């Protein structure tokens, strides 16, 4: 019964953070926005978690990498062994 209800319905994903914030262009200098898309360890969160489209995820990832190069955001922490 549960599967029958899901078939015709739309996929419910996470709300898109960029659209909710009204962001049109992702900027590498906007660290407050970019920090929403990295974990506490500094890793870039996946599309499944953030709810972004493929193009938006690419833009966010590129902006995060540029901000890391400029020392505005941290690189991922190395795992302790």
UniProtKB/Swiss-Prot annotation:
Keyword entries, A-Z: Ribonucleoprotein, Ribosomal protein, RNA-binding, rRNA-binding
Keyword RNA-binding part of the UniProt annotation: yes
One BP annotation, GO: translation
One CC-aspect GO term: cytosolic small ribosomal subunit
Keyword rRNA-binding: yes
InterPro entries named among the record's database cross-references: Ribosomal_bS18 (IPR001648), Ribosomal_bS18_sf (IPR036870)
GO molecular function, one term: small ribosomal subunit rRNA binding
PANTHER family in the cross-refs: 30S RIBOSOMAL PROTEIN S18, SMALL RIBOSOMAL SUBUNIT PROTEIN BS18M
Function of the protein: Binds as a heterodimer with protein bS6 to the central domain of the 16S rRNA, where it helps stabilize the platform of the 30S subunit.
Family stated for the protein in its record: Belongs to the bacterial ribosomal protein bS18 family.
Record text on subunit structure and interactions: Part of the 30S ribosomal subunit. Forms a tight heterodimer with protein bS6.
NCBIfam families named in the record: S18
HAMAP family (alphabetical): Ribosomal_bS18
Name this polypeptide is given: Small ribosomal subunit protein bS18A
Species of the source: Saccharopolyspora erythraea (strain ATCC 11635 / DSM 40517 / JCM 4748 / NBRC 13426 / NCIMB 8594 / NRRL 2338)
Taxon lineage: Bacteria, Bacillati, Actinomycetota, Actinomycetes, Pseudonocardiales
């Amino acid at each position: 019964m549960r599967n029958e209800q899901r078939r015709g319905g739309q996929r419910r994903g996470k709300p898109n953070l960029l659209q909710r914030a009204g962001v049109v262009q992702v900027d590498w200098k906007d660290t407050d926005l970019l920090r929403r898309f990295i974990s506490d360890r500094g890793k870039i969160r996946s599309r499944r978690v953030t709810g972004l489209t493929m193009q938006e995820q690419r833009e966010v990832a590129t902006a995060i990498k540029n901000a890391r190069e400029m020392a505005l955001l941290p690189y991922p922490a190395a795992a302790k062994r």
